[in-house]
Amino acid sequence: MKKYLIILCSLCHYHSVWAQQGNYVLLQPNDGYKGIISKAAHVVPSPRQLRRQQLEITGFFHFGTNTFTGREWGTGKEDPKIFNPTALDANQWVQIAKDAGIKQVILTAKHHDGFCLWPTKTSNHSVAASPWKKGKGDVVKDVSRACKKYGIGFGIYLSPWDMNAAMYGSDAYNDFFVQQLTELLSNYGRIDEVWFDGANGEGPNGKKQVYDFDRWYKLIRELQPTATIAIMGPDVRWVGTETGYGRETEWSVVPTNNLNIASITEGSQKNLAFKPQGDMTGSDLGSRDKIINAKGLVWYPAETDVSIRPGWFYHEEENDKVKTPEKLLDIYFNSVGRNGVLLLNIPPDKEGLINNSDIAALKKWKQLRDNIFKKNFAKNAILESSNGINAGLILDNNDATHFTTTGNDTTAIIEIQLKTKATFNVLQLQENIRMGQRIEKFALEYWDGKAWIMAAQGTSIGFKRLLKFSTVIAVKLRLKILSSRLNPCLAEFGLYFMKV
């Protein structure tokens, strides 16, 4: 599922709401360097962004006519009669996802070929024209109900590009798309996420479409106000690759440089969408060098997406190419463990079931994670901070509480005396992002009986940071916060052991 790099950050329409929540701030010419850093430290996620970050792992179900043609991208000319999953079981999909630790799933309700997995009133190119359940089936309903049954979130992917729609490339298509979006947002209960990608190819008439994103966002906020709008939307950005690997330094607070500041300040509703200047897929998005010349700053966290297979749709010939549990674990460390949310695609097969190869990999992946994180060797440790308060809160297993420094200190040292000597090689850190993302550099050292030895070091933390390092046996350690934007707000600290 390749994306055209048209990463659209449509943020200004809901600025008035964001301003109250603190996930957006305007920068003024007289702010100065310290003022800008202070403002950056106070940008925080909206409630919907916080809820989504706490999910950590979400799932994708790519399913449609491509499943039956062997394609990744269809043509829009597929005969709906080819869609006939003989054993479709959405409960199986969702249960397998939940058992793997996935907290929310997204279904491709319509991919670029235009085939709709629900009986839409807008087009004949849908499940209603297929032999599946004699045209009475509704995949969106099945998955929605399964998510409710198993207690996980449900989201929809709706491709703006539609190779089948005759009016694509005209103003009428935006009306058509709004009708489809309205059906999905109105008839299937709570929708937790709407996922748009940036593909914008030609329709049947050879024309491309000017997407009315501002209108779509307004509709989503009206009909499903708690839903996040991802990728081509204001709440979540694409990390920039489909490998599952995030940046070493991942800031959720990033610049926006082409706002009409006056219009936003006055609450104008005329400019509902804008494209940010700069590359949202670059290697550095939120460092001091990047934010210092910005016009505004916004909380715009990263999503890291990858498929469990080489392709996004199911292909039988890829059954022996499913990612290994060990590879999935490495992806987890480099996505969730780098301040991102992992979106893992698990495509159902032609029968309408998750393949056994995928199931086996997912089960073992969950076991590997459970084995690592079942015991925090720092639990019940004695903590002493050089210049802060509530150091013990970093061991309370609550990401809403935190240690912070006194006065204006932006650095700190927390000494950790374990109950007994322990063997560990994984560090987990979390900030209380309700207070913003602040920590810029940290280091973990252990006492070998003679001197302090470096075990691990890193830059940004955000919601979660995981670092693997050479195995250490120690009883005394110290965590050094070396740089922070204002007072650091460290929520959690953990030491774990991973078999290598």
Q: Where are these predicted regions, by residue range?
A:
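Inter-blade boundary loops/turns of WD-repeat beta-propellers
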Residues: 432, 447-449, 498
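Bacterial Sec-dependent N-terminal signal peptides
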Residues: 1-22
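Extracellular Ig-like/FN3 beta-sandwich strand-entry sites
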Residues: 472-474
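Mature catalytic domains of secreted/periplasmic carbohydrate-active enzymes
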Residues: 20-408, 415-417, 423-430, 437, ...
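Asp-box/BNR beta-propeller loop motif
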Residues: 1-4, 447-454
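Exposed low-complexity, polar/acidic, P/S/T/G-rich flexible segments that act as propeptides
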Residues: 487-500
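Short beta-strand elements bearing conserved aromatic residues within extracellular beta-rich modules
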Residues: 442-444
